[in-house]
Amino acid sequence: MSTAAAQTVGPSADYKISAEYTSTSPDGATKVEQYAKISPDGDYTWQFWARHGDQLTLLKPEQPDYAAGFRFTSDSQWLVRMQKTAAGEGTLYLYHFGPQGFVAATPKPLGELAWAYFNGRPDSRKIKKPDFHIDAGLLKGTDDNYRWMGEKWPDSRYLVITLSGDVLPNGRHSQLRSLRGWRCRYDLQHGRFDVPPDFAESNAKATAPRPE
């Protein structure tokens, strides 16, 4: 079976759509539909499908337990999946529209890449390394290119990602929120991260020490 044909098959019959989670691209051409399969024990497995005309594309990977949030860039060509993975934890996946529909745009989850970028920067040495409630989020603003932040960036060029994490309690301290919304920017055109100078004040607060 060809790739194109396989993409039109869609979810198997044991997956049922949860219509309340359906989201639509700004140009109206793509809908993201979320389907859940419930096991006899009541466990959920979620699949996410992008519907563009008569083409259905599975947005891998599937996810146990949790539905997801989705945001498109204003040009409708990029799609970010905001995925809860556990209580207080989450990551991001990035997809790009092409001949096969929306497909993964990065070899690893975008959230994982953002953490790797943070861990290579001096800010990471200012804090206790998070080992609990590890979360990567997408700051709102993809619809207006972050103009609400005062930015004047090109249309659909950048994403702003926030990172937060806790440190588990031990004999010396209680649970700590060691990183609180540290920001970086992802360049969709070139596939790389940076930290613009105007993020400095926010990131200083995100890494400021808290009493143990």
Predicted regions, residues:
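Surface loop/turn motifs at the tips and blade-to-blade linkers of beta-strand repeat domains
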Residues: 14, 59-64
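Short glycine/acidic-enriched loop and turn motifs that connect beta-strands
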Residues: 37-41, 85-89, 166-170
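Acidic, small-residue rich beta-repeat scaffolds with periodic aromatic anchors
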Residues: 1-18, 91, 99-212
